[in-house]
């Protein structure tokens, strides 16, 4: 399960390494909005919000594994829960602990914001975004009667995941009192499209183990799912280029996103050849290259 001693299974259950992407997302949003690193109270708010996102994502990842235990006995028997490395009772406590840490961190950010010039009112959009992410989480994972049960609805579930990923950037921008910053919203749109395409391809990749689940790929078949994923990637490409055309980012900085465009285009032949794992990995690499380029452009502008 991992080479990190007693913490190894927990590291895997929480996907703690992958969850650090949320930390990057918060600071990305803040730096896009400010054109540089946050300082003073803004720096403290950003750190607390980054911790809140990290622990929120850890909790979400563990909850997903907990609810998918039977599926993972087929798909991923080496995961901490199906392998027995972590008990179900311990996992529930870990999920609650991480969500508590997220709540405490967001409360700390609120307390810090209340002492700034903008006051708590200027910070409220951050709270709205956090609550929005919590709404998506509960309605994605929960099978309760009042839940939207997004996980069981195929594409709406993929959209919920994608929105929650993109919202991290807006969360970071809102933390520095810039919730409507154009650069942050541009990256939000790009991130949502990238993630949605990748989630669909990952569903195709997992079709064998997802038998009985109503994923989009299971509903329409692998070829139609791959076609939609590619259409979304073309929209992603357009959303990467448009901000340079309308002045949100300087035209001269367009060269910075060329590597991301090239890697994105490499995903097409992989989809045609049904090499779904390779395709979704290329999509992820392209997204990271794009985010790095847009951050660099924002800092240099």
What is the predicted role of each segment?
Residues 3-8, 25, 145-154, 224, ...:
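Extended hydrophobic alpha-helices typical of membrane-associated regions
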Residues 33-48, 159-207, 223-240:
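Functional transmembrane core segments of multi-pass inner-membrane proteins
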Residues 52-103, 192-240:
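Solvent-exposed interhelical
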Residues 2-3, 70-74, 132-145, 183-186, ...:
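Hydrophobic, membrane-facing alpha-helical anchors
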Residues 23-67, 102-107, 123-138, 180-201:
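Membrane-embedded alpha-helical segments that form the functional core of polytopic membrane enzymes
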Residues 3-12, 20, 83, 89-180:
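Intramembrane alpha-helical segments
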């Amino acid at each position: 399960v991992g080479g990190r001693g007693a913490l190894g299974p927990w590291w895997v259950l929480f996907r703690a390494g992958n969850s650090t992407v949320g930390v990057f997302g918060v600071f990305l949003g803040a730096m896009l909005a400010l054109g540089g690193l946050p300082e003073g109270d803004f720096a403290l708010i950003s750190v607390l919000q980054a911790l809140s996102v990290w622990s929120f994502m850890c909790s979400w990842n563990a909850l997903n594994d907990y609810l998918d235990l039977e599926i993972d006995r087929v798909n991923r028997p080496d995961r901490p829960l199906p392998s027995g490395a972590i008990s179900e009772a311990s996992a529930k406590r870990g999920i609650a602990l991480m969500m508590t840490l997220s709540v405490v961190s967001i409360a700390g950010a609120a307390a810090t914001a209340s002492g700034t010039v903008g006051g708590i009112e200027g910070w409220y959009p951050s709270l709205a975004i956090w609550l929005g992410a919590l709404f998506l989480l509960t309605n994605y994972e929960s099978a309760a009667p009042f839940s939207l049960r997004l996980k069981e609805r195929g594409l709406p579930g993929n959209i919920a995941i994608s929105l929650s990923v993109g919202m991290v950037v807006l969360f970071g921008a809102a933390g520095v009192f810039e919730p409507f910053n154009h650069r942050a919203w541009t990256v939000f749109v790009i991130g949502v499209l990238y993630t949605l395409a990748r989630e669909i391809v990952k569903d195709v990749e997992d079709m064998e183990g997802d038998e009985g689940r109503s994923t989009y790929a299971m509903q329409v078949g692998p070829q139609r799912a791959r076609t939609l994923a590619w259409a979304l990637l073309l929209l992603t490409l357009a959303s990467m280029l448009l901000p340079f055309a309308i002045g949100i980012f300087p035209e001269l900085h367009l060269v910075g996103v060329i590597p991301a465009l090239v890697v994105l285009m490499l995903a097409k032949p992989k989809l045609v050849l049904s090499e779904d794992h390779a395709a979704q990995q290329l999509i992820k690499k392209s997204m990271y290259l794009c985010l790095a380029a847009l951050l660099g452009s924002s800092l240099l502008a």
